[in-house]
């Protein structure tokens, strides 16, 4: 925003996967949001989104910060503009804006949870591998792909599948 003269609309880019180690991390996006809102000559903020989503935690941090900044700067409107894709966590972020715009061909939405893994129990037995895993502490071998899935692991993922989308809906 350096060198911007006169009233203008600030632009914050959200491109690619939303994750702590990506360009679209909460730290990077939040820093850009703060600069955009704090700039005295910015009259509004555009979130230009092209992201398939990613970490619900990172997206939640950004969502919360947009809400906080909107309260602190109520005169500055936030507009989410989705280009090719604004799915999952990216749509969650867009939901914090005053208005959302997208092209009729944009992919928008896809709120939910995907979690996958593999179970190798039969393969291990078939090729004669005897795996030894030594742990201390509860849940240290949680989601280990080699033994049969425990009932608690399935119940855990069921709770994640139910609770994470609910966060999107209630915020």
Identify the meaning behind each predicted range:
Residues 1-76, 85-171:
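Small-residue-centered hinge/linker elements
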